[in-house]
Amino acid sequence: MSNTTVTTLDDNVFERLLRERIIVLGQEVDDGVANRIIAQLLLLSAEDPATDITLYINSPGGSVSAGLAIYDTMQAVAPDVATIATGLAASMGQFLLTGGAPGKRGALAHAEIMMHQPHGGVGGVQSDIRIRADMLSRLKRQILEITAAHTGQPFERVEADAERDRWFTPAQAVGYGLVDRVLTRSP
């Protein structure tokens, strides 16, 4: 039996983008997606630690632990990681967008950006529920502190604004400090 791998047009496109130091997050963040993006960040950093990497984000969010793994890698690699919102950057997608290199975070003109507090389901016996609730509280504080640091907003404002879904236009996201600029091309 033959072990042939089928290469699709999508595979070729993403390989070509990777050669240009472009990574695309175009889906929900889960462990598999995080592992792929982390591997790409590490590869590009090893190949050329001095040249920026660009991460395009069109994601509704996803797993907090997977997103934090991507974020930590973005902060750890030598090259700056520029981030660009395309379409939707919500929840963990917004967090990763805001975690890009200072001065190198952008949003396309019609991108939608949404910030809110992390959430997750809790079930089981009472002691497990308490442990999980404590962990979620810790993660919430951690994410809000990181967001406050990247935006320059006071922690209390970020905490209040993230209590419910908070939607931003690209221009509003610039004003809040989630991104640095709106990317447009003059006709």
Question: Where do the language-model regions lie?
Answer:
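Terminal-region recognition feature
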Residues: 1-187
